[in-house]
C-alpha cells in the first residue's frame, strides 16, 4: 500500500506545477496585436485581410483594422465601400487613430475628385504631427490635390516628400518635380518668390532657367545640365537626373538626307495628299522660318452657305465634318492684317535642303507593307506619312525600325521610340479650345455640335481635355441641318443654353462633407449640372452658314446679357466673312491656324494661290510645310521635353507619346473687324 499512497501524494504535489504550465502555455499561444505594424506601414495587405482581422478583433485593435481596411479600399478603387466603412468609425478615438482618420478623409476626397474639399481638409493638418509614413501620404495628397497644375506649393510638396521615399518612389518624385517645372511658362516662373533657406527649390529653379534658355539647342542644353550638376551636387535632381533630361543628354539628331513621303495620290484622298506634297516640297526647297504670333485678319468677301463636305475616310482636317472631310472651292479675298505680330520665343527654323533626296510613295496604289519594304530597300532615313488613319494603324502593326512622322494618329496611341504623330483633326482643335476656354477662367461649358459622328468625337475630345485640366461636367447640345436651323429662326424658338452631360460623374463616388465626416454616395443636382452654375461658355462646331443661324438663335432665347462667352472652331472660318457677317458675329472668338490668322502672310498668299483660295486645302498645305520642319527636328520632338516649333498650323510641342500638340491662334469679331484675343 505504501507505493499507492506515495503515488497519490506525488500527484497532488505535481498538480500546481501542471496547472501553472498550462496557464503559461495558454498565454504563449495568445496572438499579439499586429495592427500596429500595419498602421506604421512596415507591413501591408489587401482590404479582405484587414476586414477579416476587424471582424475577429475588438476595441482599439478593431478600430485599427477598420482604418487599415478603409485605406486599402481607397487604394483598390473601392471608394463606395470605403465611404460606408468610414462612416461607421466611432467618435471616440485615440490621438493616433484620429490623425489616421483625418488623413483618410483627405484621401477619400481625392478618390472622389473633390479637390477643393481635399485642400480644405489638408489645411487643417500639421504634417509635423504625423508619423513618417503618414507624412509621405500627406505630401502625396497635397500633390494630388494640385491636379498637376504647376505652382510653388506643388514644388514645395514634392521637395518635402522626396526624403521620405524609397528609391523607386524617389525617381517618380523627381520626374514629377521636373514635370511641374517644365510645365510652367517663363512668365509663371518669373513670378515665383522663394525663401532664402529653400536651397533645394533654388537649385530646381536654376535648372529650370537652364532649360528655358537652351531647350531648342540640344548641345547647349547638355552643357548647361552638366554645369548645373556641378553647382548643385546635393540636389536630388543632380544625383538622379529627371528622365526627360537623361534623354536630352543622350540626344542624337536624325538624318533627313533621304526622305520617304507616303501619301495617297489617287482616289478621293488624292487632293489632300497632293496638297500636302506641295507644301512639303515648297518648304524643302525654300526652307521655313518661325511663324509670328497671331495677327488678326479681316476677310472682305460676303459670307455664303458652304457646300456639304465630301467624306474621305481617315484624312485629318481641323475644320471639317469628319476626320477627313474637306470642302470644295471657296474663293475669298486676301485677308488684311490689323495688328503687328509679337516676337517669337521659340525661334526654330528648318533650312532649305534642295539636295535632300525625296521619294514619293503612293499609298493608294499598293499595300502599305510592300511600300515599307521598298522604303527600307531604298535606304530612307525618315518616313513622313502615311496620311490615312487605317494606314497609320497598319504601320504600327509592321513594327518598322524606321523613324516615322505619321500624318495622322490611330484610335489608340502607342508609344514607339521611332514614331511621332502629327494630325490636323477636329478633336485636336477641340482639345485646344478646352485649354483656351479654361485659361479664360470659364467653369461651366456647353458644347454645341452637329448631330453626327463628328459632333460626338469633338464633344468627347473637349470633355476629356476639360476634365484633365480639372474641370467638371461638360454639357452638350446637338443641332440638325441648315434647313432645320432656318426653321428654328423663323419659328422664333431660339437655342437654350442647356444640355446633357457628356461624361456624367459615377454615382458611387460622390462627395464627402467637409465637417466631421459623413460621406455621400449619391451625387447632388449641383454636381450633375456644372456645380449649379449657369453655362458661361459655349463652344460651337459649325460651318459659316450654320453659325450664321446659331448665334442669333442663342441671343433670341437668352438675350444679349446671358453672360455666356461664345467660341467657335475654325470650321466657321472659311475666308468668306463679309462685313455683315462680321458684325453679326460680334464678340465671338474662334480658333485658326497661325498662317491663316496672318502670322505668315507670304506663305498664306502662296498657299491660297496654290489651292484656288480653298481655306481647308490651305490648312493641308500648311501641314505639309510643318511636316518638313518636324522631320528636320524629329529627334528633338521625340527626345527633348518642351521643344517647341512656332509652326504654320500652330505652336507645336510633343507629349510623352510624341503626339504633336498644336496651340492655335484665337481671334475675335469686334466692331466689324477681326482682332487677336488678348
Swiss-Prot record:
<feature type="compositionally biased region" description="Low complexity">
    <location>
        <begin position="330"/>
        <end position="340"/>
    </location>
</feature>
<comment type="function">
    <text>Regulator of peptidoglycan synthesis that is essential for the function of penicillin-binding protein 1A (PBP1a).</text>
</comment>
<feature type="region of interest" description="Disordered">
    <location>
        <begin position="302"/>
        <end position="340"/>
    </location>
</feature>
<protein>
    <recommendedName>
        <fullName>Penicillin-binding protein activator LpoA</fullName>
    </recommendedName>
</protein>
<keyword id="KW-0449">Lipoprotein</keyword>
<keyword id="KW-0564">Palmitate</keyword>
<dbReference type="InterPro" id="IPR008939">
    <property type="entry name" value="Lytic_TGlycosylase_superhlx_U"/>
</dbReference>
<comment type="similarity">
    <text>Belongs to the LpoA family.</text>
</comment>
<keyword id="KW-0133">Cell shape</keyword>
<dbReference type="GO" id="GO:0031241">
    <property type="term" value="C:periplasmic side of cell outer membrane"/>
</dbReference>
<dbReference type="GO" id="GO:0042597">
    <property type="term" value="C:periplasmic space"/>
</dbReference>
<feature type="lipid moiety-binding region" description="S-diacylglycerol cysteine">
    <location>
        <position position="27"/>
    </location>
</feature>
<dbReference type="InterPro" id="IPR007443">
    <property type="entry name" value="LpoA"/>
</dbReference>
<feature type="compositionally biased region" description="Low complexity">
    <location>
        <begin position="513"/>
        <end position="528"/>
    </location>
</feature>
<keyword id="KW-0998">Cell outer membrane</keyword>
<dbReference type="InterPro" id="IPR011990">
    <property type="entry name" value="TPR-like_helical_dom_sf"/>
</dbReference>
<dbReference type="GO" id="GO:0008360">
    <property type="term" value="P:regulation of cell shape"/>
</dbReference>
<feature type="lipid moiety-binding region" description="N-palmitoyl cysteine">
    <location>
        <position position="27"/>
    </location>
</feature>
<feature type="region of interest" description="Disordered">
    <location>
        <begin position="496"/>
        <end position="528"/>
    </location>
</feature>
<keyword id="KW-0732">Signal</keyword>
<comment type="subunit">
    <text>Interacts with PBP1a.</text>
</comment>
<feature type="signal peptide">
    <location>
        <begin position="1"/>
        <end position="26"/>
    </location>
</feature>
<dbReference type="Pfam" id="PF04348">
    <property type="entry name" value="LppC"/>
</dbReference>
<dbReference type="InterPro" id="IPR028082">
    <property type="entry name" value="Peripla_BP_I"/>
</dbReference>
<keyword id="KW-0573">Peptidoglycan synthesis</keyword>
<keyword id="KW-0472">Membrane</keyword>
<dbReference type="GO" id="GO:0004553">
    <property type="term" value="F:hydrolase activity, hydrolyzing O-glycosyl compounds"/>
</dbReference>
<dbReference type="GO" id="GO:0030234">
    <property type="term" value="F:enzyme regulator activity"/>
</dbReference>
<dbReference type="GO" id="GO:0009252">
    <property type="term" value="P:peptidoglycan biosynthetic process"/>
</dbReference>
Amino acid at each position: 500500500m505504501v507505493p499507492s499512497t506515495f503515488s497519490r501524494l506525488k500527484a497532488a504535489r505535481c498538480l500546481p506545477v501542471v496547472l501553472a504550465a498550462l496557464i503559461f502555455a495558454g498565454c504563449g499561444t495568445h496572438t499579439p496585436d499586429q495592427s500596429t505594424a500595419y498602421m506604421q506601414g512596415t507591413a501591408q495587405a489587401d482590404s479582405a485581410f484587414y476586414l477579416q482581422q476587424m471582424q475577429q478583433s475588438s476595441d482599439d485593435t478593431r478600430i485599427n483594422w477598420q482604418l487599415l481596411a478603409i485605406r486599402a479600399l481607397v487604394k483598390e478603387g473601392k471608394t463606395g465601400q470605403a465611404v460606408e466603412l468610414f462612416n461607421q468609425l466611432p467618435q471616440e478615438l485615440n490621438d493616433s487613430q484620429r490623425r489616421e482618420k483625418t488623413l483618410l478623409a483627405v484621401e477619400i476626397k481625392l478618390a472622389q475628385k473633390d479637390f477643393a474639399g481635399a485642400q480644405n481638409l489638408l489645411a487643417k493638418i500639421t504634417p509635423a504631427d504625423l508619423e513618417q509614413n503618414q507624412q509621405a501620404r500627406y505630401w502625396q495628397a497635397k500633390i494630388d490635390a494640385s491636379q498637376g497644375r504647376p505652382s510653388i506649393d506643388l514644388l514645395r510638396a514634392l521637395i518635402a516628400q522626396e526624403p521620405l521615399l524609397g528609391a523607386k518612389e524617389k525617381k517618380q518624385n523627381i520626374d514629377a518635380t521636373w514635370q511641374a517645372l517644365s510645365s510652367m511658362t517663363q512668365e509663371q516662373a518669373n513670378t515665383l518668390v522663394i525663401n532664402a533657406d529653400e536651397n533645394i527649390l533654388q537649385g530646381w529653379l536654376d535648372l529650370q532657367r537652364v532649360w528655358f534658355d537652351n531647350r531648342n539647342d540640344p548641345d547647349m542644353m547638355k552643357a548647361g545640365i552638366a554645369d548645373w550638376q556641378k553647382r548643385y551636387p546635393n540636389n536630388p535632381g543632380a544625383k538622379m537626373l529627371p528622365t526627360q533630361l537623361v534623354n536630352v543628354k543622350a540626344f542624337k539628331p536624325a538624318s533627313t538626307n533621304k526622305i520617304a513621303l507616303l501619301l495617297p495620290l489617287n482616289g478621293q484622298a488624292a487632293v489632300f495628299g497632293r496638297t500636302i506634297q506641295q507644301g512639303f516640297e515648297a518648304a524643302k526647297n525654300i526652307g521655313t522660318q518661325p511663324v509670328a504670333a497671331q495677327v488678326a485678319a479681316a476677310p472682305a468677301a460676303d459670307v455664303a452657305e458652304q457646300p456639304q463636305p465630301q467624306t474621305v475616310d481617315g484624312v485629318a482636317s481641323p475644320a471639317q465634318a469628319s476626320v477627313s472631310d474637306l470642302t470644295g472651292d471657296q474663293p475669298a479675298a486676301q485677308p488684311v492684317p490689323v495688328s503687328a505680330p509679337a516676337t517669337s520665343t521659340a525661334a526654330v527654323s528648318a533650312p532649305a535642303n534642295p539636295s535632300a533626296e525625296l521619294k514619293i510613295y503612293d499609298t493608294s496604289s499598293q499595300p502599305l507593307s510592300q511600300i515599307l519594304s521598298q522604303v527600307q530597300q531604298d535606304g530612307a532615313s525618315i518616313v513622313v506619312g502615311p496620311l490615312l488613319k487605317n494606314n497609320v494603324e497598319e504601320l504600327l502593326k509592321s513594327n518598322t525600325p524606321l523613324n516615322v512622322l505619321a500624318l495622322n494618329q490611330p484610335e489608340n496611341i502607342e508609344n514607339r521610340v521611332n514614331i511621332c504623330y502629327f494630325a490636323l483633326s477636329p478633336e485636336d482643335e477641340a482639345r485646344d479650345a478646352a485649354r483656351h476656354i479654361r485659361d479664360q477662367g470659364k467653369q461651366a461649358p456647353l458644347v454645341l455640335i452637329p448631330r453626327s459622328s463628328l459632333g460626338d468625337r469633338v464633344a468627347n475630345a473637349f470633355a476629356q481635355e476639360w476634365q484633365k485640366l480639372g474641370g467638371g461636367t461638360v454639357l452638350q447640345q446637338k443641332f440638325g441641318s441648315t434647313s432645320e436651323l432656318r426653321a428654328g429662326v423663323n419659328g422664333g424658338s431660339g437655342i437654350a443654353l442647356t444640355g446633357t452631360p457628356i461624361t456624367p460623374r459615377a454615382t458611387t463616388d460622390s462627395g464627402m462633407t467637409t465637417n466631421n465626416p459623413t460621406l455621400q454616395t449619391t451625387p447632388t443636382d449641383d454636381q450633375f449640372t456644372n456645380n449649379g452654375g449657369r453655362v458661361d461658355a459655349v463652344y460651337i462646331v459649325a460651318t459659316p452658314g450654320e453659325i450664321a443661324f446659331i448665334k442669333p438663335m442663342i441671343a433670341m432665347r437668352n438675350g444679349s446679357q446671358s453672360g455666356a462667352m461664345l467660341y467657335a472652331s475654325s470650321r466657321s472660318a472659311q475666308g468668306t466673312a463679309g462685313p455683315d457677317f462680321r458684325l453679326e458675329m460680334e464678340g465671338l472668338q474662334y480658333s485658326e491656324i497661325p498662317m491663316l490668322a496672318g502670322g505668315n502672310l507670304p506663305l498664306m498668299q502662296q498657299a491660297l494661290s496654290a489651292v484656288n483660295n480653298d481655306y481647308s486645302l490651305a490648312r493641308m498645305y500648311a501641314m505639309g510645310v510643318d511636316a518638313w520642319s518636324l522631320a528636320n527636328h524629329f529627334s528633338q520632338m521625340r527626345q527633348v521635353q518642351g521643344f517647341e516649333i512656332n509652326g504654320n498650323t500652330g505652336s507645336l510641342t510633343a507629349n510623352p507619346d510624341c503626339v504633336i500638340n498644336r496651340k492655335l491662334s484665337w481671334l475675335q469679331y469686334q466692331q466689324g473687324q477681326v482682332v487677336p484675343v488678348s
